[in-house]
Amino acid sequence: MSTIERLDDGRMTDEYTSWIITALITTVAFLLRVWNVGFPNSLVFDETYYPKDAWTMLHQGYEATWPDAAKANADIVRGITNTWTPDAEFVVHPPVGKWLIATGEQLFGFNSFGWRFSSVVFGSLLVLMTIRLARRLSRSTMVGAIAGILLTLDGLAFVMSRIGLLDIFQAFFLVAGVSAVAANRDWFRHRLADHLRTIGNPHLDADFGPALGWRPWRLVAGIMFGLACGTKWNSMFVLATMGIVSVIWDWSARRLAGAGTKAWWSFLRDGVPAFVYLVVVALLTYLATWAKWLVTYPHMVFGKSWAGPAPSPGLSKVVGKPLAALWEYHRQIYDFHTGSYMMTQTHVYASNPSGWLVIQRPLGVDAVNGIKPSQQGCKAVGDTCLRVISATGTPVLWWFAAIAWWLR
């Protein structure tokens, strides 16, 4: 195989067929996830936070407090949805996921279907992105389809696609970001192949090659990673990893094309623009997700002191009071996640991180005891039933897939 042919690897010819297969699997995933998604008609697990935050963001522009969580949850089920106070809630996750939940609530109302609908949509889109990513990496539509089917039926992905939490949105944006980085790899290699055809050489003859500063897929990746970080902070670890991988792929492509020792310049000449596309764009996207907060923070109870004297006078002079207030708020969030409060919290159903990779203890989403016979499907005779919703993934699939990828 020639250098140009190796660089051109990945130009698949079944694009139309692959999209039909992708659409069919994604449709099945959507139908499975949307069926009876309003059950149970109550706020389960951490839905006690995010759907209520989303609802007040629609009406107040920020996350407001609900004075009695248990009473508020019961009231919401009965259709009483306005018992929040003007006081702002101290939230510990960025707003993107909550705005997406709010979209479903705006369309369908503040009910269990409304606050879960966006999760259904993004859980289905996650299947779509997984199919396309697996197809690109494997150069096989069949492998992509298998990946999509497996994710469609994975218990953890399925449950997370049917409750109003943030994780499914984060997962979608991360997979979309990784997919864009992989697309940039192919795009760059194909441009190098086109360049070699244009100059009429089978390789670069130790020349660095074209700069190719415009990288549309890297721009998309930066936006996706910014939205992922705007959902949950730990997305930044994936951003950092894929940034490094992306630059290494550029170096590898130039080396394959015949740049020789000049390929090492890729870490500077391709690396600096990559930093801008991925990190700077992600940061700007992340800041944009806080736009509503920057407008409303002076009206929040915890922000009233910020409406007067600046929280950080020195920083305020440099970036302005709104951004200085946002920085101070981020410092408080970081302290919450890493401080003594979180370190000392306990839970009767807590699981040790060492068991997460094998799901030693499934994630308990909801449990109802004492269901009487002939009610809610209970067929017990002379006894009662227990109904449990658990987010249980497929560790055997995860680990065998990882081993197979390593041995490929």
Briefly describe each language-model feature range.
Residues 1-291, 379-408:
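Membrane-integral, polyisoprenol-dependent glycosyltransferases
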Residues 357-391:
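Juxtamembrane membrane-water interface segments that cap and precede transmembrane helices
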Residues 38-75, 282-361:
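Aromatic-rich transmembrane-lumenal/periplasmic boundary elements in polytopic membrane proteins
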